[in-house]
Amino acid sequence: ETEIELHAAKAMEKFKIIPSGVASKIRKKSKIDVKRIDQIERKTKHDVIAFLTSIAEKVGPDAKYLHQGMTSSDILDTCFNVQLKQSANILLKDLDNILISLKKKIKKYQNTFTIGRSHGIHAEPITFGLKLATFYEEFKRNKLRLKSAINEISTCAISGAVGTYAHLNPSIEKYAVSYTHLTLPTSVTV
């Protein structure tokens, strides 16, 4: 959450909405204190307010420049999408390793006979390499599906209440998106 807030603050600095240097001051002073955030959230019943209050306690007066024109959804959805993309990229690397391993095993067992199965019972003889090749092809399809899912979730939405940009210049979102490695949505949320 801190990173998304800071990217937006940096964008606001660029467009002279907030004073220059504020984002770096906030970055230096802000320390995440999970226990304190939990304490505040028990009272406020609002996770983002608890987060911002905790940061404000550490940062002081400059904290007023955080979250300007934004909603909880701007921060949480964008943050969640960054986390999903990072996690999915780890899975992609793992899938690549599985594919490499399967390819080696396919070659190794290309002449090793085994019993094929159909409807859960013995069928015609096949090679174990052929059986592994079916797994290989399925993992390739899984990789394509995961890449497609990454593209779907890789959006940054910093557009204010119900996506209207009423209190937030769309340029802020465009600038902040470059730091998140996400893309702009084709339409805003309503």
Regions found by a protein language model. Give the residues of each.
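A helix-coil-helix interface module used to build multimeric assemblies
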Residues: E1-Y165, N169-V177
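Conserved small/polar residues in nucleotide/adenosyl-binding loops
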Residues: T180-T186
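Acidic, Ala/Val/Gly-enriched low-complexity intrinsically disordered segments
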Residues: V188-V190
